[in-house]
């Protein structure tokens, strides 16, 4: 953890992390209508243990500039990780190169500086429109939003949401992170999203079931 934000967590077996990763996994499980999921910012694959515990059999493709986290993940998770592909690459270059469209893209990039962790500029200025172009019509993206270096929450949220017509945000009592769930087609109301996520989190015994609140995002419908 840095600056109140969890960067990665690797478990030796499927199960809850009792952290933001459980909510990311529950979001993938709840909103991916197919099984093709991309992870931008793989790190140690922290989302995969709770996702597999939830019964999510998605085909996962991850990208990260650093290979070390993936190696650790494989050492601990080879017996149960399921279909996982990894590329050591720049996230924008990798996503540009991908053929076909994704059911869900999870954006989990971060950059560390002086002991703190921030959202990189590319996550706010470049990736939202690229991600939108790489999603199926019914596809959804999940952004793990961290504090900005020199941007407000409102500015970051507005820029990330701009290409999308529908969305909700998940807030935490215990973490600075905010999770944005965005799509081109209508999502359930915030109250229903809260119920869906809490049900998934409760199913794996995650403490996050009592830690989250879900709010609507007012977006310009496309």
For each feature predicted by the language model, list its residue ranges.
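Conserved beta-strand signature within the Rossmann-like core of class I S-adenosyl-L-methionine
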Residues: 138-145
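A generic structural signal for alpha->beta connector loops
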Residues: 57-59, 81-83, 138, 164-165, ...
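The AdoMet/dcAdoMet-binding core of the Class I SAM-like
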Residues: 15-137, 149-157, 175
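SAM/dcSAM-binding transferase cores
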Residues: 5-14, 28-30, 177-222
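S-adenosyl-L-methionine
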Residues: 1-2, 22
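A short, flexible beta-alpha/helix-coil linker loop
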Residues: 4-8, 110-116, 141
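Conserved S-adenosyl-L-methionine
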Residues: 142, 164-175
């Amino acid at each position: 953890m840095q600056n109140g934000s969890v960067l990665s967590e690797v478990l030796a077996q499927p199960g809850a992390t009792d952290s933001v990763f459980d909510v990311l996994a529950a979001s993938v499980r709840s909103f991916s209508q197919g099984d093709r999921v991309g992870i931008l910012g793989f790190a140690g694959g922290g989302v995969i243990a709770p996702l597999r515990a939830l019964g999510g059999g998605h085909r996962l493709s991850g990208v990260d500039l650093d290979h070390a986290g993936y190696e650790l993940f494989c050492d601990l998770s080879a017996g149960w990780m399921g279909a996982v592909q990894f590329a050591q690459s720049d996230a924008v270059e990798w996503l540009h190169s991908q053929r076909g469209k994704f059911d869900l893209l999870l954006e989990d990039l971060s950059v560390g500086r002086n002991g703190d962790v921030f959202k990189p500029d590319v996550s706010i200025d470049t990736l939202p429109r690229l991600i939108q172009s790489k999603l199926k019509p019914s596809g959804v993206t999940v952004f793990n939003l961290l504090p900005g270096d020199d941007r407000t929450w409102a500015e970051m949220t507005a820029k990330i949401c701009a290409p999308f017509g529908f969305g909700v945000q998940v807030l935490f009592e215990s973490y600075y992170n905010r999770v944005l769930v965005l799509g081109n087609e209508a999502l359930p109301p915030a109250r229903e999203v809260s119920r869906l996520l809490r049900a998934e989190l409760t199913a794996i015994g995650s403490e996050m079931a009592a830690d989250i609140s879900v709010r609507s995002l007012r977006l310009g419908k496309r």
